[in-house]
């Protein structure tokens, strides 16, 4: 179990929908500090969060997840002045715009990766940090493909690949930073938007999705926090239909074990 009591949490996302509901649950867990970095100001949401737990310090920065890493560094230098340290980094910025592939990939994948690369040195035990947990909030169509939202699905597959790679013991044994992902199923805030399919052939499906049964954002937010509390390094969870399910990870490349053994053997030889 991962105990959130007294933790310093940094949430990179829009403070609305799933992120807001997740933050509400976090505020009930006696966290000490919450930093919110998002693209637009939302003082009403911040006030709502503060009313849940007045003793928890909340900080806010306007943040563009697609900015250059050098600019991100400037932001997180300021974040660290207020936060002192980060125990939990949650990446939840998301965009589904099949007509703008670059923006979709940059928001969902590249921006998340750059944010992680920027924050990791502050958390890394080898660099003076205390370790911690990185949580990547992604989608179930990062596990199974979507013929309708092809660009969005590709970006979410990338999140899963990045999460599993960064969670490898090669890193975790050194930096003490666990990495996990939560894949959200269809959620009301998502399907209520006007959604465009990657190709016109899929538009009728995209239109029908708005009438499909979906979980509420509040239930999804609760299960994201539940997954955090139950997390172990490298785990992938599905938060869908009001439930929480641990993904059974599978290796498809039959050479994976041999290749890893080869790399480890060469590393040992280099140290001799």
Curated annotation (Swiss-Prot):
GO terms for cellular component: cytoplasm. GO terms for molecular function: oxidoreductase activity. Keywords: Oxidoreductase. Disulfide bonds: none annotated. Signal peptide: none annotated. Coiled coil: none annotated. Substrate binds at residue 139. NAD(+) binds at residues 11-34. InterPro entries: ADH-rel, NAD(P)-bd_dom_sf, Sc_DH/Rdtase_CS, SDR_fam. Pfam families: adh_short. It comes from the Eukaryota. The active site is at 152 (proton acceptor). Transmembrane segments: none annotated. Belongs to the short-chain dehydrogenases/reductases (SDR) family. This is Alcohol dehydrogenase-related 31 kDa protein.
